[in-house]
């Protein structure tokens, strides 16, 4: 998807504290429609806290979050999901005793419009909705993420790398405008990392999806390869923002990661 000048997500002067610990201090940035916008920083920099403020798990003590020019600072997570904000997590939030297909279906529930009675009896509009949603999942998501062979397997029996795909699939089932990806590459081997990076690019670039991505990730090689812009945090403060090249050469970023090393990025290619 081509990056536009349209601002889709805007974060203004966010402050978040837990007791006496300042997790975020005056964070401001904007994400344009069609971007892969990555957030980097050492452990404890505030990256996940920031995602939690964007999707509504946390409400900041100060500042504002806007999505599609609407103030969503006090909106609940389900309200933001209805607006088109989806999310994956560092710690997988899957139902291990359910099948892959059932886990993915949970991401579609917000689009269901039938009532309780017709839903329980499964007739008429309910049946049509079920067919439509199942078709969307099978035709678009399962095919995209190459998980047809595991669709009926219990999630808890799958290797970790495939569970990561299932969580991404469930987030995509919302058919989001923007997806927040919290360390999607963590714990994956090299082949799985390359596959996941390809999936993220497909989600962003393919005409069917064209989804804006906000990526929190520690794999600097992938971040620098696929991002349009990057923001760096350290101890709850923004220390840099710009193109991947600008950020990887920024002395504050290099110092935060590697002391006084010459360059942050060592290419994998």
How should these model regions be labeled?
Residues 2-269:
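Glycine-rich phosphate-binding loops of nucleotide-dependent enzymes
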């Amino acid at each position: 998807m081509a990056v536009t000048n349209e601002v889709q997500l805007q974060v203004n002067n966010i402050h978040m504290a837990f007791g006496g610990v300042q997790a975020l201090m005056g964070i401001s940035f904007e994400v344009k429609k069609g971007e892969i916008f990555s957030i980097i920083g050492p452990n404890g920099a505030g990256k996940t806290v920031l995602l939690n403020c964007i999707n509504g798990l946390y409400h900041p003590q100060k500042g504002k979050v806007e999505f599609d020019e609407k103030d969503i600072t006090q909106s609940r997570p389900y309200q933001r999901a209805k607006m088109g904000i989806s999310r994956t997590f560092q710690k997988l939030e899957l139902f291990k005793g359910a099948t892959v297909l059932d886990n993915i279906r949970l991401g579609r529930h917000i689009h269901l419009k039938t009532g309780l009675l017709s839903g329980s009896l499964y007739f008429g509009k309910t049946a049509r909705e079920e067919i439509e949603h199942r078709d969307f999942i099978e035709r678009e998501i399962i095919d995209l993420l190459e998980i047809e062979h595991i669709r009926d397997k219990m999630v808890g029996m799958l290797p970790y790398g495939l569970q990561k795909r299932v969580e991404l699939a469930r987030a995509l089932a919302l058919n989001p405008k923007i997806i927040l990806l919290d360390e999607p590459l963590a714990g994956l081997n090299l082949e799985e990392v390359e596959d996941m990076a390809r999936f993220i690019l497909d989600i962003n670039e393919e005409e069917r999806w064209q989804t804006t991505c906000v990526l929190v990730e520690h794999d600097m090689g992938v971040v620098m390869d696929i991002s349009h812009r990057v923001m760096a945090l350290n101890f709850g403060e923004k220390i840099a923002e710009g193109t991947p090249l600008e950020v990887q050469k920024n002395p504050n970023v290099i110092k935060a990661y590697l002391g006084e090393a010459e360059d942050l990025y060592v290419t994998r290619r």
